[in-house]
Amino acid sequence: MARIAGVNIPDNKHTVISLTYIYGVGRTTAQAICAATGVNPAAKIKDLSDEQIEQLRGEVAKLTTEGDLRREVNMKIKRLMDLGCYRGLRHRRGLPVRGQRTKTNARTRKGPRKPIRK
């Protein structure tokens, strides 16, 4: 297994699919990385040379991925909560943030049902 950005990349999958195992790299970004490095997106990781894998590492290193991206997202959510804006309040209360209905549904965000005490 090749290791890129601290993630073990599967050898037996296509390059584009393997790169999506990195947090912050989706299909579109993976295709852009392959185009920038000149690596065939349909080639499997085990068939790539060490030089090509180094090129992929270099391109991925230019992006914000893994721990840095997770930290950045958490800091943005924390900033909203500190501001006290509507989105921050929804995050703080553990409710849907983007305007979804909550009378029914929203169980994933709200958690399991709590019994009504009489």
Swiss-Prot record:
The keyword Ribosomal protein applies. Gene3D superfamilies: 1.10.8.50, 30s ribosomal protein s13, domain 2 (4.10.910.10). GO terms for cellular component: cytosol; small ribosomal subunit. Residues 93-118 are annotated as: Disordered. SUPFAM superfamilies: S13-like H2TH domain. GO terms for biological process: translation. One of its GO terms (molecular function) is rRNA binding. It comes from the Bacteria. Keywords: Ribonucleoprotein, Ribosomal protein, RNA-binding, rRNA-binding, tRNA-binding. Part of the 30S ribosomal subunit. Forms a loose heterodimer with protein S19. Forms two bridges to the 50S subunit in the 70S ribosome. Located at the top of the head of the 30S subunit, it contacts several helices of the 16S rRNA. In the 70S ribosome it contacts the 23S rRNA (bridge B1a) and protein L5 of the 50S subunit (bridge B1b), connecting the 2 subunits; these bridges are implicated in subunit movement. Contacts the tRNAs in the A and P-sites. Belongs to the universal ribosomal protein uS13 family. This is Small ribosomal subunit protein uS13.
